[in-house]
């Protein structure tokens, strides 16, 4: 009988640990861009100018090195969800170059937001963790 009571007590204590939930970290993936940054890229610029403005591309296709992709996804973690920082999905800027390394086409500017949470130029508040 004592084993049964002890087993039930330990089981109920361990089940109580799930009340607090699991801490989840923020998951930023890719290159965060703002519309102000992306709109500076113009047709006629070269590789170096684009890399200076936007940084290295997130994806460069080895089979098509004349296309650069800047992709950004953000999944908020525990504290970001409490601060109501939204998730960011589907931000995909594509820049096409010709054989001489000059920009010929830019696609996806409409997917880039005005600001990104947590970036220095952003008007939105940066998430801060409470002191320990």
Swiss-Prot record:
Signal peptide bounds: 1-16
Record GO cellular component, one term: Bam protein complex
PROSITE patterns the record matches: PROKAR_LIPOPROTEIN
Keywords in alphabetical order: Cell outer membrane, Lipoprotein, Membrane, Palmitate, Signal
Compartment annotation: Cell outer membrane
InterPro entries (alphabetical): BamE (IPR026592), BamE-like (IPR037873), BamE_dom (IPR007450)
Membrane protein topology class: Lipid-anchor
Primary localization: membrane
Alphabetized HAMAP family for the sequence: OM_assembly_BamE
The family this protein is said to belong to: Belongs to the BamE family.
Protein task: Part of the outer membrane protein assembly complex, which is involved in assembly and insertion of beta-barrel proteins into the outer membrane.
Subunit structure: Part of the Bam complex.
Protein name: Outer membrane protein assembly factor BamE
Native organism: Acinetobacter pittii (strain PHEA-2)
Gene: bamE
